[in-house]
Amino acid sequence: MVRYGELFLKSEPVKRHFIGLLIRNIKRSLDAAGLSFRHETPRGRILIYGEEPRKIAAEVARVFGVVDVSVATITGNTPEELGRVAGALGKKHLTAGMRFAVRAKREKGSGGPDSQELGRVIGGVLLDDQPGARVDLSHPEYEVFIEARENGGFVYDHRIPAPGGLPFGTQGNALGLVSAGIDSPVASWMMMKRGCGMVHLNMDAGRWAGCATAAGAVENHRRLSLWVKGYPLRMLVVDSSPLYDAMSKGVPQRYTCVICKRFMFRVAAKLMPGEHAEAIVTGENLGQVASQTLSNLAVISSAVNVPVIRPLVTYDKAEIVAIARRIGTFNQKPGDLCCRAVPAMPSTAANLAEVIAAEEMIDVDLLIAEAIERIRVVTALNGEITVHEKPEHEQTSPV
């Protein structure tokens, strides 16, 4: 049994469209896992039937737009039928002294006692089977969920949390800057959670980056693909080492990081039309490093005339790490990810005119054009990686 959240708030035509896309994404995920199934869509739920319900539930719990998933037992909608199934579950889990609650809901028009009375009846069944247990609706140790519908009933005692959000692919596409670090993959995941199709862009700094940097970025990209199974998730890899070579010779060192970020944004903006992307997404966080002061973020953003979305801008580092651990992109031993171009004293309030003058000194426009000519594409599908040169005019949108 699949529950979705804020889709209820949409108008009926939009809700039908979004539910259709959610079902499409569930199908792709289950097909990728090799699980056979069929589905139904009663009001407010998606029911999935299959011979491996727990495996199905585990896969569906990673689909964006799903709030939670339960392995449910189908029965009739009378108190007696619901009580027999609930009692069988209770006998497996309820012990003397344990606090429990029954969460019952009866659909209008299904007949029988209302939700509150149905909960009391089922609670009585559980107490008869385990007299030492006690009802506690506020802080239960065990819960049984009852849904009585017009055409039958469902009983379950566990809800597997899912990411929530909106179905992947309902909110257009964005180009996300993804590195080997912690923040950028979390930012991309959060955009996926809100229904946005993502194309990733990685800047390969070559000898200017730590030896584990390139592989770390690909690994982050690969792990993110496990959240959108059935979709080829693409990452454009740009050789940015010529930029660092040029900056090392002719740019005030204090502006290195700001110019680097502006370069990334300008490359992204050039690539956006071909990817049908409508925004740039970054893992930037207010005040975390020198380039992320409000002053420098403004200077960096001024390099482009497209929307720039920073999902993590207000998050503490500990909060970002917690999300990275939960979604599987946190690496306990990341290896050497150092940037060898970071100056000892980077500017925290870059002067825009001076930055533009420095860019002109090294002909950033030419560097951008040359970088785009050397793009490689890394495609991740269900956690499997393929690397190839980008064919001319190839679309890299995942949806």
What residue ranges belong to the model's regions?
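RNA-binding accessory domains that recognize and position tRNA/RNA substrates
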Residues: 1-175, 185-233, 349-352, 378-399
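General small-molecule cofactor/ligand-binding pocket signal
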Residues: 136, 236-238, 309
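The feature marks non-catalytic terminal segments
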Residues: 335-339, 343-399
